[in-house]
Amino acid sequence: MQLKLTKTLPFSENFIMADSEEYKTVIGISFGNQNSSIAFNRDGKTDVLANEEGNRQIPSILSYHGDQEYHGVQARGQLVRNADNSVTNFRDLLGKSHDELTLHHCHYSANPVNVEGQIGFKITVQEDEESDPKEKILTAHEASVRHLRRLTESAEDFLGTKVNGCVMSVPVYFTDAQRKALESAANEAGLPVLQLIHDPAAVILALMYSEEVLIDKTVVVANFGATRSEVSVVSVKGGLMTILASVHDENLGGEQLTDVLVNFFAKEFEKKNGIDPRKNARSLAKLRAQCEITKRVLSNGTTASAAVDSLADGIDFHSSINRLRYDLAASATLNRMADLVTEAVEKANMEPFDISEVILAGGASNTPKLTSLMESIFPEQTIIRSSSSVTPLQLDPSELTAIGSGVQASLIGHFDAADIAASTDAQVVDVPHLTAPIGINEGENFVTIFDIETALPARKTVEVIAPKEGAAFIPIYEAERSVKVTKVEPEPIDEEEAFSDDEEEEPEEIKERIAIPKTLIATITLPDVSPNAKIELVLQIDAEGKLTASARPKDGKGTNVRGSTA
């Protein structure tokens, strides 16, 4: 049998319970470039916590004015009048040198500067009210420490107890250096990291846990954030998640959708007043802030207004836009997002009909047009999960990574740190997977027992029916995957209702994945089984790919048989 080594994400059942309760209060953290969230599991339910200002989505922003440091929503308010002293989008700068800085999203705040080869921000602060303002360098590491410390304080205020650690989700594209830098910043902030889990794993875990459904499936997780988008194809089998492929675009997200509205309204304002508000930093900041609100309203309604007092040269601005016009204006950006999903499926060497479920996560995924684009890519049997789909998400797409991290935190919070570290060691996480299905023939159909991408070792038990007479002969095959195409003829057109220019519809092609037996790898024969008896067949594959098969009549009559491949 052919095997391949693939990174698999272990669930908490892989861990061993420690005698001590080293971590009693463990939270889940989603640390985004633009927003962050905190989640905690209490009495079996994981919820996103609100900070002292009542915000569940906490802006990842720091701003400085005089001797004051502002954080979150208060800091976001400073972007209009104090942008040069505000620090944003610093998460993805962690673990990078200034030479590695090829793209950043700090266009409307303090720009990154070179700090002895590292990335930092130049701000002006006062130590107290009586001292003179002076320049200070705040590195991306220091900004992350301060932000994470504020999140920890908010969690402790809400829970009324000290937080002992966290599980944090990170993008698949994060390098080892970025992961280590994030852990370092969290530790310095007084928030020990028990485990870093990938964003798509957190998304799936949030939904699987809330719905208490654990079935084998192949899932596309399309995470459209504020500044970046990441799409992953994930195999979920036997409680293990394996990322089969992942692609990302570091310049595609909600900000590009906001830009669409900014340009739309700016052109309208310029046409009426002869002034382009985009040429003035403060006017642009005010318009962007309003467009963020307008964008959110369009996610739920068909029309949204935009109003900015004194947008430029003392002139007020009032306008509106409907969703149809917005979708048209944003079509290029939305199509890029859809193309990223297609690219991920192709990278996994799959077809759209191989995908069981598509989950749209992240704030930008609230755009209803994205859901309709997914419905045009995938067949009807693929379940689309979004805030506006036929099978809607029961959770806020912006909170899925935080909730998934909170779920994992509740599952491993009382485990020993050494056991957690051992369970995520490369030898445990990088495990072999099947590259071809294994199963048996049942009549004219092939029944897959172990599907492609099953993590090894694996064990399954199935039931087969003995023939009416004679010995039970059970061949076990390694199969090859193929595509079955069924053509469905269109319904005939009623001649009385048909128009002369009506074109005859083409037959619809329905594609489905099938497995065809190719290589016989084992045979089980029960010579003296009762006619039509139920036979319990147990197949087990070890980490080296060796198959062991055993069979026994469930009525106890006959001989038990056991064998294995070489």
Swiss-Prot record:
InterPro entries documented for this protein: ATPase_NBD, HSP70_peptide-bd_sf, Hsp_70_fam
UniProt KW keywords: ATP-binding, Nucleotide-binding, Phosphoprotein
Residues with Phosphoserine modification: S86, S500
One Gene Ontology molecular-function label: ATP hydrolysis activity
GO biological process: 'de novo' cotranslational protein folding; chaperone cofactor-dependent protein refolding; protein refolding
Domain of life: Eukaryota
Residues reported in the UniProt entry to bind ATP: A39, F40, N41, R42, D43, G44, K45, T46
Keyword Mitochondrion: no
GO cellular component term, pick one: cytosol
One Pfam family matching this protein: HSP70
PANTHER family given in the database record: HEAT SHOCK PROTEIN PDR13, HSC70CB, ISOFORM G-RELATED
Entry's family note: Belongs to the heat shock protein 70 family.
Protein name as catalogued: Heat shock protein 70 homolog C57A7.12
Organism: Schizosaccharomyces pombe (strain 972 / ATCC 24843) (Fission yeast)
